[in-house]
């Protein structure tokens, strides 16, 4: 909490720019975790500071479930894509919870490609919104949807195990209002 809040305050006080772009998270919307609460507080700092210093525009981006590849192995060992890539060699994958109130019992997420995030950031440099912009598609996919898609695209098969729910996982995280900065450059099939 302190890192996000104090770090944001230090950066915004030191950097003198006409357009401040802040990277937040979709979890700031519902504040269901300490991380989400800390990012929401940091968003408030950005908005208050930039509003009081009227010469400074801002855009706050709430990133939803960012996916995509840069040619290197993903670095989040808890992330879905990291574990799917790992399953190519281990030949097994674990889904955490299959008893959610969703179409197949697994969590639903709104995935957005990292290149779409970059595109939105570039647009905001040219035209800041002075508001919070949520980056997602407004369309959810279940974990099983993603696992099956991954298997099909990579023409592989592996065992899928079901483990207990992870602490803090929410049933569904799908964006309701899609930002105008989202150009829908990719679909999940891509």
Locate each region found by the language model.
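C-terminal substrate-binding subdomain of Rossmann-fold SDR/epimerase-dehydratase oxidoreductases
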Residues: 86-190
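Conserved Rossmann-fold NAD(P)-dependent oxidoreductase catalytic core, especially the SDR/UDP-sugar
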Residues: 2, 6-36, 52-59
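Structural signature of the Rossmann-like NAD(P)-dependent dehydrogenase/reductase core
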Residues: 20-24, 59-65, 110, 134-136
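Active-site Tyr-X1-5-Lys
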Residues: 32-64, 83-89
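Hydrophobic positions on the long internal alpha-helix
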Residues: 7, 11-15, 46, 120, ...
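Flexible, glycine-rich beta-alpha linker
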Residues: 28-34, 61-79, 102-103
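Conserved cofactor-binding/catalytic machinery of classical short-chain dehydrogenase/reductase
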Residues: 7-10, 19, 41-42, 113-116
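Short-chain dehydrogenase/reductase
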Residues: 1, 5, 32-40, 74-82, ...
